[in-house]
Amino acid sequence: MARTVNCIKLGKEAEGLDFPPYPGELGKRIWESVSKQAWADWLKHQTMLVNENRLNLADARARQYLARQMENHFFGGGADAAQGYVPPSA
């Protein structure tokens, strides 16, 4: 049976992650309160941030920026929008 969490991002019960997706206390908080669906949404947003801001993940400052954005996305006021991104029209 799948583990469920009360997802703070979706505001409902949903299937939880199988393991903490990030090291340390932040990873534990995410594992305890973020669903698989919300994590997948974050990964898409993170990819847009990396691409639009041309982040080099070998740079410690870029990794720190993404960690702050991840924490803001789940537990704060939201992550930065990807600058230059134009959503496709329907």
Curated annotation (Swiss-Prot):
Per its UniProt record, what HAMAP family does this chain match?
Fe_traffic_YggX (MF_00686)
Q: Which Pfam families match?
A: Iron_traffic
Give any Gene Ontology cellular component.
cytosol
Similarity field: Belongs to the Fe(2+)-trafficking protein family.
Tell me the protein's name. Answer: Probable Fe(2+)-trafficking protein
Q: Name one GO molecular function term.
A: iron ion binding
| Alphabetically ordered keywords of this record | Iron
Does the keyword field hold Magnesium? Answer: no
Q: Which species expresses this protein natively?
A: Albidiferax ferrireducens (strain ATCC BAA-621 / DSM 15236 / T118) (Rhodoferax ferrireducens)
| Any one Gene Ontology BP term | cellular response to oxidative stress
> What InterPro entries would the database entry show?
Fe_traffick_prot_YggX, Fe_traffick_prot_YggX_sf
Q: What does this protein do?
A: Could be a mediator in iron transactions between iron acquisition and iron-requiring processes, such as synthesis and/or repair of Fe-S clusters in biosynthetic enzymes.
Its lineage opens with: Bacteria, Pseudomonadati, Pseudomonadota, Betaproteobacteria, Burkholderiales
Mind telling me which SUPFAM superfamilies this protein's record contains?
A: YggX-like
